[in-house]
């Protein structure tokens, strides 16, 4: 079988699996976040944290819950790393340095999972399981909760109440993430992913000498790493490591886990707003962008430029033979168009244009289909902008789902869109202008600039993947990337929740003959165009200096 055909068949199998899961999981999520009943274990959790799950919150109270919970998570994870040297199950690893502990705590709480450390050489069992794995669950649940709050803003009228953050958080963990992760972990273990608490083993090599291998609770962390679009690997090689991702089947299964909840949430959006077709319009836009990026990436990496690449079947540098170009390209596009950041190949080794595609996927805002929760609310904000643009073109007040998009709403949407590019470009410019950050660059020229641009794009968009040529374990990068991750995660949430509160207070406007039909393919095309044009205008100069210059020079 040719590598191209193998890649196409994987794409078709993945699409079929997602299509089968879309309706039942989307319906289930709608029931979870609409049910007035609480499970017994949920009641125990509410009692233990002193929360009243039946109290409705306005957007400032909802935001305070998000920020307070996340701040507590940062402090706990920071202290856990700083105390690792005296904790049991540390495997003899020392405590983490302050700047790296801050970076890692910010990274995992912000659902970014940027890693400036070698997982198997720095983190013991306690930090991995009680710290990092726990944040993989709760940070994903926070993202879903904020997305559901925005959906309620569209669905509700004449009220400022958006639900209860603590109830949404707990339900996301207990009813959604834990059950799916439990089943997924069993599947991964059955396919060869390790799950144990063994120590460090010294093994012999075929060519002589010895090598140290770590055990660990890898399968349980691997599944939520993908399902929660987190991305932080147990091992430094991430999902390229055979202990995390041993076969082509596990590779495809992990891609399925990454896309599962973001795709299903579009169905949940349609059900909760009373129009399933609106959900399909959003899903269609996401799917079209994702499919276009996959096709472009495969074409770029399969393109033959000389006899060596032709003999290898394409650009195989940095890719695992067991996955090939098809599986690697599919994973790379999926992980950067969502907020996952896990890798089964090394993006720095992709062709110049291939690396640019991964970077552009993050620059879009990771909304196709995006991260768990963050993808949906990011695309809905872009839908508000697209409706506003359409209203300007026809000269009537823009409306979306029966809600008027006025000055207040478009200001919130504009602030949401501007915050991430500002972080990316300001931090990148500072790193390039100052002498110290440049010492961390392995490469010079266009590729060296791409390493810096990729790092801040990844951090600010809460992705976490990296161009491996950059040494990010320095005080400058640990501090600035950590700050970018926190600001890139929580400042946009402020505007999302403010937008939700503004929409929820409105009275529905009845549709008329002149109302834009936002469930039609025409609007989906307008939405996709708005996403691509806004991103292109914002980032094109930076992309021209980095991946485009490198790709065109090749």
From Swiss-Prot:
The keyword DNA damage is annotated on this UniProt entry: no
Functional note: Part of the high-affinity ATP-driven potassium transport (or Kdp) system, which catalyzes the hydrolysis of ATP coupled with the electrogenic transport of potassium into the cytoplasm. This subunit binds the extracellular potassium ions and delivers the ions to the membrane domain of KdpB through an intramembrane tunnel.
Keyword Ion transport: yes
A Gene Ontology biological process term: potassium ion transmembrane transport
Organism: Streptomyces coelicolor (strain ATCC BAA-471 / A3(2) / M145)
Subunit structure: The system is composed of three essential subunits: KdpA, KdpB and KdpC.
Keyword terms of this UniProt record: Cell membrane, Ion transport, Membrane, Potassium, Potassium transport, Transmembrane, Transmembrane helix, Transport
Family: Belongs to the KdpA family.
Protein's name according to its UniProt entry: Potassium-transporting ATPase potassium-binding subunit
Chain's gene name: kdpA
MF annotations from Gene Ontology: P-type potassium transmembrane transporter activity; potassium ion binding
HAMAP family to which the protein is assigned, alphabetical: KdpA (MF_00275)
Compartments reported by the entry: Cell membrane
Disulfide bonds: none
GO cellular component: plasma membrane
Topology within the bilayer: Multi-pass membrane protein
Classification via InterPro entries: KdpA (IPR004623)
Ranges annotated as spanning the membrane: 3-23, 60-80, 131-151, 174-194, 252-272, 279-299, 323-343, 352-372, 375-395, 412-432, 481-501, 522-542
